[in-house]
Amino acid sequence: MIIFWKGENDLSENFDRIRISLASPEQIRSWSSGEVKKPETINYRTLRPEKEGLFCEKIFGPVKDWECHCGKYKRVRHKGIVCDRCGVEVTTSKVRRERMGHIELAAPVCHIWYLKGIPSRMGLLLDMSPKVLEKVIYFVSYIVLDPGDTPLLKKQLLNEREYRENRDRYGEAFKAGIGAEAVKSLLYEVELDKMSSDLKEEIATTTGQRKSRAIKRLEVVESFRLSGNDPMWMILDVLPVIPPDLRPMVQLDGGRFATSDLNDLYRRVINRNNRLKRLLDLGAPDIIVRNEKRMLQEAVDALVDNGRRGRPVTGPGNRPLKSLSDMLKGKQGRFRQNLLGKRVDYSGRSVIVVGPNLKMHQCGLPKEMALELFKPFVMKKLVDKAIASNIKSAKKMVERGREEVWDILDDVIKEHPVLLNRAPTLHRLGIQAFEPVLVEGRALQLHPLVCTAYNADFDGDQMAVHVPLSAEAQTEARLLMLASNNILNPKDGKPVVTPTQDMVIGLYYLTFISAEAFSKENPRAFSSTDEARMAFELGQIDLHEKIRVKMSVPQKTGREILKSHEAQTFLEEIVDTSVGRIIFNDAIPTSLGFYNEIIDKKKLGNIVYECYRLEGNARTADMLDSLKSLGYEFSTRAGITVGVTDFETPLAKYDILQEADQEVEAIERDYEVGLITDEERHAQVVEIWNQATDDVTEVLKNSLSEDNPVYMMATSGARGNFQQIRQLAGMRGLMADPSGKIIDLPIKANFREGLTVLEYFISTHGARKGLADTALRTADSGYLTRRLVDVSQDVIVREDDCESVEGIWVGRIMEGSQLIEPLHQRIIGRVSVDTVIHPDTGEILVEENQMIDDDIGYEIERAGIEKVKIRSVLTCKTRHGVCKKCYGRNLATGYNVEIGEAVGILAAQSIGEPGTQLTMRTFHTGGVAGDDITRGLPRVEELFEVRKPKGQAVVVEVNGKVRFGENKGRREVEVLGENGEVLGTYPVHYGSRLKFEEGTEVEIGDALTEGPLNPHDILKTKGLQEVQRYLLQEVQKVYRSQGVDISDKHIEIMIRQMLKKVKIEDPGDTSLLPGAFVDISSFEDENNREIRAGGLPATCSPMLLGITKASLNTDSFLSAASFQETTKVLTEAAIKGKIDHLIGLKENVIIGKLIPAGTGYSAYRETSISEAPESENMVSD
């Protein structure tokens, strides 16, 4: 049952929270419009609903609008009249979607959710095991309700024989019952207040198993006590019947009927109920009545949750029928199928083709599709312009495709953006807005530069089009979603729109000058760039020829301007360059400086980023369009192709192979003599062949000329890399077998020479594994994204500053002597906690609570500062979200984050989207111990779900000295105190590698052996901040190994959500329950309230929950129920009478309200806009 709290005006839209609880029999009757007495559905001759049946018009309302069953009243003028002949109210047929009925049950039945759920709520309340309860409810055993003065015990079970014997012996001196009625009378006797105080006492005085059971029981008792639910309501006397239009029956072509499974299940219940009534009226023997009651119980079970107990009821073809619970569960259930995502009008889909002539903000929309999508707009315009007299004739004109219609359509789509979406939508750039341009044909045209964001190509991909209708929707699409406004990638703040493939090769070719040409002594000279271009157009000079030009040269690079904030300066100089480079520099703003170098993909990315930071969105979009046109033009002119003759195998390859073969032979001889083990032999052979492969690649690289098309493709970053060229013209190298172990027999041939049969066979393992992995990875990555979104969907920027004084220390990341991530990358776009001062000059580099922008970031790094304390979401004090200061810069815009930004979803998408690129499965390193190292996607999942890692390290829980020993054939490590006493003993496998020598000092939380750490151990031994640091570092490690950049703040948001709950250890005088998981903020509130009242506060310990568990433990039951384990979540919520305050996004999507993010955020909704009064003095002469 759901209650809405309404605001002052009585609109159901105006509620701000929603409550779910158990329904009492009176409530069920009050919802109902009448009792369903017959199992009939519709009459097979008249095809009208049967009276008092499951589709009865008297109960549920008329089948046809404004028409009663007998036909006495037809037409809308009789609205509201109840027909005196058939009793049907004259109203719209829509009421058949909302009017409910009910069935009066002849015997009480138990609701299976509360009996069979885990834990069994009924069992905990009555202190009986679910098995025992089941025996009573399904008429196997009697239960003693009141022993009277007999030696029987209350709640003792008696089988049929024992019951008869005791009846014969004691007569009516004791009371016993069977079935749901007996359980109902036991529930009637439950005194919640008394039970609550008894259990609290028991918890205080007992330990171990009894205490934990008492805690579980107390939780259920408190749920009932505080929610006002009566435990007797878990037993049903009345069964609600859902509206008929939600369980429809439709006629198929062949005259047969298709019906919802629910009708079959309801029919079984009604049949059995009516039969039971008849048997009771006839006074049938007890055994027959009991059997009928049991069957009624089973029929209601099947209706509520088919298959929860025993074999499910099946329909035709042995298919289990879908019960009410199944209607809610899973991907096809009500939550995920209809509430969280719906199919929408004003949408279409088609194949995409490239639109190389489009501007960045445009897309090509096929004429037919546009006409259909914008039909209502076109019709209105036709009537407005008096081309058509009314809407009906306008519709005819549109359908016939008359001349005038196309002109109007052109008019209508001007400046009306449409949204393009490509599935799978892995991040927010999977839906962007474009202005439509009408095109012939039936394919959508897509701008080539947005392909990266959509991950689209033109090999048959399809995309969907959606039309934003309202003025607000169009404005949002234009301002926030227009493709030219989405140049940066939200996951790392780098440009996602950079020229690719043909464009890159074109620009590389354009700016290319060979080393030979560049060393030419006295090139031709020109007095201006225009003169040089003229000479080029007249064929006097070549595109790549070195020339000398007098020109006005920008003196600063884009980066220098960004740092100094000064304007660009120019000087007349004579420059050695080429016509190609002059043409290239004409396409980019002068503020970026003059690029006199060969341009590859990486440099293009930098140019786009600098242009965005210096010149803003619009100018960057223009520049990208010019670069696109230039790139395509010159890649066409270059005509760069790949032919088999472009791959020449270097002769030195054969010498390298011969040398390697000799080395391997020597190792094999050592192995045969027994000097080395097989593992050592394998490792050395692999090492030799890897070196040989690298040597061949090096020789190959040097043998390719600079203007070799393949070399140009690889070096420019247009397509391919040297690994692929190595396989085509060098050697394929070593391959792995299906288990991932490297085969020590290399493939010496390349594809140009062709492989032998054995070589081909060896290489098929990898190819097959690659395909299988890709398929598995996609599904796993999608599921990970779904869990991440669910755990973080309610994290929204809610305030300007939470005034937290805490933060986290960050420094550069090194691995050995190699720099992995410099300091500036980690601090740019974050807010500093303290004032940072230059160690040498004493100058203030950044004030406290000031944003660290690009130049301050570089400045701090140059000053030699190693660590900076920054504000972080991990230490943010804002409730249900984060504050602007702790979050910092919004990476998608490069500016400060706005209030109302849904940063949780942004973070989930940023982590989930690259998931498909991560490798799968474990790798066998084939080292000495042959460890299985979990890497890639499974490792990320393991970290976010905080599972116990495979081959985890043993962690010390005390300080002391290490001593090795053995005990019963097991290796042990003992930690000794100062006086030599043993403080802790840790069993260690013989296979694991130890990190410490005997006698070394160890501290709490140190790992004794190699291997990944268990995050729970870190939390226990080293505390909260250390586990946050570890999780962040480990997740980043996996992504970095695949070359994926993700900003720390996204991962921090997830870690914060995982650490949001605490476990109550001792409740003190608060109303909290021991062992309960509570939000940190709720815990603090309760304690503050208790301290103010002079009571004893509660104590807690921090909890680290995996993302699935954290999602299910969210305060919102709607969000949790729509995620997983729907029935379990709803059972719990109903008993507790939970209130959902509709704080997150999912809850609001489910009930159909605006989401509280972006312009739907309350702070923005409550602003009112009024026209400024026109004052007279504003009008001037």
From Swiss-Prot:
It comes from the Bacteria. The keyword Nucleotide-binding does not apply. Transmembrane segments: none annotated. Its EC number is 2.7.7.6. Zn(2+) 1 binds at residues 68, 70, 83, 86. DNA-dependent RNA polymerase catalyzes the transcription of DNA into RNA using the four ribonucleoside triphosphates as substrates. NCBIfam families: PRK14906.1 (NF011498), rpoC_TIGR (TIGR02386). This is DNA-directed RNA polymerase subunit beta'. It comes from Syntrophomonas wolfei subsp. wolfei (strain DSM 2245B / Goettingen). The lineage of its organism: Bacteria, Bacillati, Bacillota, Clostridia, Eubacteriales.
